[in-house]
């Protein structure tokens, strides 16, 4: 029986096929003053990545009518270290346009929260204004994890590695990540 992650990855493969060959022009976007890592180090305490999420496969609809721009402004005004924007539509009802809109109004780092399985998704995230991308260890084999991690770093993006167990943590630690 397929897991939710399996179903999501099937959809991501379809999405990647549509994205391949496209070019993503980075528009003039508001840049964060500091990286997420710099913010955390300067605060010398745990930082908060505040999330904009309309829905999830496990919870269903969470906040279908959320205005990502207003939510981002509220998060930034209340001390969020970064903002996570769900960009997956089929399962989370987010979009890359949400990320673009948020980037226009805040100057803190933005995490593109999606199921990244290909470099083209990283290119799209960067062009939309993301400063951080998410790599989920459970969704990638070691070779792909390393390839995408290194590519994102080459693009001057921060990488948040998501792990759910000790085995995934060991796999991710071989990359010497700054954010787990």
Please identify what each model-predicted range represents:
Residues 1-110, 117, 142, 156-178:
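Conserved N-terminal beta1-alpha1 strand-loop-helix module at the mouth
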Residues 77, 127-128:
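Flexible glycine/serine/alanine-rich "lid" or loop that lines and gates the nucleotide-sugar donor pocket
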Residues 87, 108-121, 127, 133-137:
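Glycine- and Gly-Pro-enriched alpha-helical subdomains that act as flexible
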Residues 102, 124, 151:
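Hydrophobic/aromatic ligand-binding patch that stacks against planar heteroaromatic rings
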Residues 134-136, 140, 144-157:
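Conserved catalytic cores of soluble enzyme domains
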């Amino acid at each position: 029986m397929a897991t939710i992650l399996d179903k999501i990855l099937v959809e991501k493969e379809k999405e990647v096929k549509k994205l391949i060959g496209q070019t993503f022009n980075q528009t003039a976007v508001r840049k964060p003053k500091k990286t997420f890592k710099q913010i955390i180090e300067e605060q010398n305490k745990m930082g908060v990545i505040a999330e904009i999420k309309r829905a999830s496969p496990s919870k269903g609809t969470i906040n279908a009518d959320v205005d990502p721009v207003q939510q981002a402004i509220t998060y930034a005004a209340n001390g969020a270290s970064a903002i996570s924007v769900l960009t997956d539509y089929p399962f989370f009802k987010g979009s890359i346009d949400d990320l673009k809109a948020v980037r226009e109004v805040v100057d803190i780092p933005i995490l593109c929260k999606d199921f990244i399985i290909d470099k083209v998704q990283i290119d799209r995230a960067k062009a939309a204004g993301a400063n951080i991308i998410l790599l989920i260890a459970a969704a990638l084999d070691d070779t792909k994890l390393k390839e995408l991690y290194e590519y994102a770093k080459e693009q001057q993006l921060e990488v948040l590695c998501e792990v759910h167990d000790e085995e995934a943590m060991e796999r991710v630690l071989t990359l010497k990540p700054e954010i787990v």
